Amino acid sequence: MIETIAAVNQAVNSFIWGIPAMVCIIGVGLLLSVRTGFLQIRKFPYAIRTTIGRMFRKKDASDGTMTPFQAVCTALAATVGTGNIAGVAGAIAIGGPGAVFWMWCSALLGMCTKFSEVTLAVHFRERNKNGELVGGPMYYIKNGLGQRWQFLAVLYSLFGVLTVFGTGNATQVNTIVTAIDSAVLAYNTSVKSFLPTLNLIVGVVVAMLVAMVLLGGIKRIGSVTEKLVPFMALFYVVLAVGVMVLNVQRLPYVLESIIAGAFNPRAFTGGAIGSVFLSVQKGVSRGIFSNEAGLGTGSIAHACADTRKPVKQGMFGIFEVFADTIVICTLTAMVILCSGVPVGYGAAAGAELTIAGFTATYGGWSSIFTAMALCCFAFSTIIGWGLYGSRCAEFLFRTDKVVGPFLVLYSFVSIVGATMDLGLLWNIADTFNGLMSIPNLIALLLLSGTVAKLVKEFFAGEGAR
């Protein structure tokens, strides 16, 4: 029975996360780019000025439940995760350095996709019985497409609830305990027998912290993420830039391997990778799965933003993809390629390759700081996905009374994830994660005209000033 479930899940997973899904996501991103006049390029300076330039200004009086900065930090908390460290390493190992170039290309379209998701989420959001602003794909399907498309909103919420326990929590906690275990063993191998107990303790502590943050409501979530995300991002950026500076002599070759290797991977992988298609596939998939453009999840956080201007908040969607993929993922690639650490091209790789890059540059002590970065990334992801799951549960059951019990259960999963091998459950959750994109992409396709109209009205009026 278990084998049958695993086989069926693998078949569905391969399709959902395979080439058809990537083609659909890229196609929708291209359509949205055309209908908005490639807004992400034309208005990129405006997007940066509107986001980074105003992040720390005093917020305008409004009726939201998060500041725009807190909203983007919450979305980034869920988006910038362990995949930025492990996923990029895997893309380079299988697709060669050229995969990074194709990752950049996918991010370019992803910027417009996420911009559209955020804009629609703010435009079609509503208030729940507690007076909180709620939105996301299920709400712009419900309020933007009408009753006959309601089943898509229900499906999105169902897939979201089924996803968060594995993708958003258990796998992340497992990454935390693995990072801590590795750091401990690097200094004292005699404590190996104590690790199961240590993992349980870590799981309990994480569960308590998650419960404290999530049960505190939307304002506490925003307060935590606006402090944690800038810290962890800056911390990782400083470490990664340090690797580039200390290995600056390799930078010209690395850039050549990325750009030229995108079209001739064989020349830069010792002949191990000869397929340009494989380089494209791995780079594009890494870009899509890293920034979550097309899944619609980030828009759930942005819908809580303290703003009356959907398009202006949408600019944070452009910034989010830029920060996640163009900055964080690129820096991970630079750590691996600039450090000169051996890459077994053609063989699967993960976080260990990135850690090896840091260790080759800074020495063994850097394993502690890498573990700290992994823990911060994973914990922030748990917080962000907790919000997503609670919003999906609230929509699915049509009452906010399920939120409290849901978050308690969600927090408890941290203990399970820290102490058990959940291989099949993780794979099933990953499949449901991919299934979330189907109703969202359909909605984006049908509402692309609304996005184009909102953009035109915004920049033609006073809103852009």
Residue spans for each PLM region:
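Membrane-interface loop-to-helix entry segments
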Residues: 24-31, 35-48, 173-180, 198-259, ...
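Transmembrane helix-loop junctions in multi-pass membrane proteins
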Residues: 2-5, 35-40, 83-88, 166-176, ...
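Extracellular/periplasmic helix-exit of transmembrane alpha-helices
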Residues: 117-129, 241-257, 265-271, 304-307, ...
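Helix-loop-helix module between adjacent transmembrane segments
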Residues: 31-33, 106-131, 138, 142-174, ...
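Flexible loop linkers connecting adjacent transmembrane helices
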Residues: 38-66, 90-100, 104, 112-147, ...
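Membrane-interface alpha-helices at helix entry/exit sites of multi-pass transporters
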Residues: 58-65, 96-105, 143-155, 188-197, ...
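N-terminal alpha-helical transmembrane segments of multi-pass membrane transport
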Residues: 1-82, 92-99, 110, 245, ...
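Alpha-helical membrane segments and immediately flanking helix-loop junctions
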Residues: 59-94, 120-144, 155-161, 273-322
